[in-house]
């Protein structure tokens, strides 16, 4: 466990179910603290990440992990496409004798697996290196894989999201709306976020959005090598929520 336990300081849980050992290290971010794996109706679920629309998926969900099992039981593996977030998901469906592994669209969370004679699935590459001596595979972005639990054969491969690359936009209105939605849905449920703010465009756009929607945040800037005129202008807008940290030349 030493290769992976630091990924989840809030809880360590080990469960043996249907002759499979499940070990999960929890970093609690969203909703109530839910100890994984979640096992319901002979289906075991472990995931790493955040589901932003979990209340829309399942209004009674105590935490985002509950929405995964809910949508899977309702719609099957294709239902995972309804999830909006940053995650990797592992489902053991003992009713259908299947293992489902899913990444989000952009593979924001790591996941490595080996499904030969033994089943090894890990969010840390180093754990697979030790256990399987490099005979492992990383899941790809935008990928849902379905394996036979007994034969380990790949039964089905789906894309998480079908992109339409035909250009239909004539202005930036929809982009701005999508950007603001992306920022706001990532705002923490219970905590005030710290936002590192440079004089550049990326962090500046995030700060502008949070300020526009009155989302309380602590903005921290390190002036070294930054455009001070820009930072001072941002300080005027953000006021006491914007702090400077001065570092020495060392």
Model-predicted regions and their roles:
Residues 1-250:
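Cysteine-centered catalytic environments shared across enzyme families
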């Amino acid at each position: 466990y030493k290769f992976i336990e630091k990924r989840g300081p809030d809880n360590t849980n080990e469960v043996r179910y249907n002759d499979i050992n499940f070990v999960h290290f929890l970093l609690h971010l969203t909703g109530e603290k839910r100890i994984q794996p979640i096992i319901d109706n002979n289906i075991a679920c472990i995931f790493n990440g955040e589901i932003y629309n979990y209340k829309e998926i399942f209004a009674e969900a105590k935490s985002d992990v509950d929405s995964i099992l809910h949508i899977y039981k309702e719609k099957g593996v294709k239902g995972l496409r309804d999830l909006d977030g940053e995650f990797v998901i592992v489902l053991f469906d003992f009713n259908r004798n299947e293992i489902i592994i899913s990444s989000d669209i952009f593979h924001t969370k790591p996941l490595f697996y080996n499904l030969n004679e033994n089943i090894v699935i890990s969010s840390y590459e180093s754990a697979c290196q030790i256990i399987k001596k490099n005979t492992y595979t990383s899941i790809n972005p935008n990928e849902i894989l379905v394996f036979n639990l007994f034969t380990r054969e790949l039964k089905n491969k789906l894309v998480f999201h079908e992109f339409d690359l035909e250009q239909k936009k004539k202005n930036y209105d929809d982009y701005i709306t999508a950007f603001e939605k992306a920022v706001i849905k990532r705002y923490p449920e219970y905590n005030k976020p710290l936002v590192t703010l440079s004089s550049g465009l990326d962090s500046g756009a995030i700060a502008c959005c949070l300020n526009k929607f009155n989302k309380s945040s602590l903005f921290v800037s390190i002036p070294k090598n930054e455009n001070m005129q820009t930072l001072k202008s941002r300080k005027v807008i953000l006021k006491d929520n914007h702090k400077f940290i001065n570092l020495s030349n060392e």
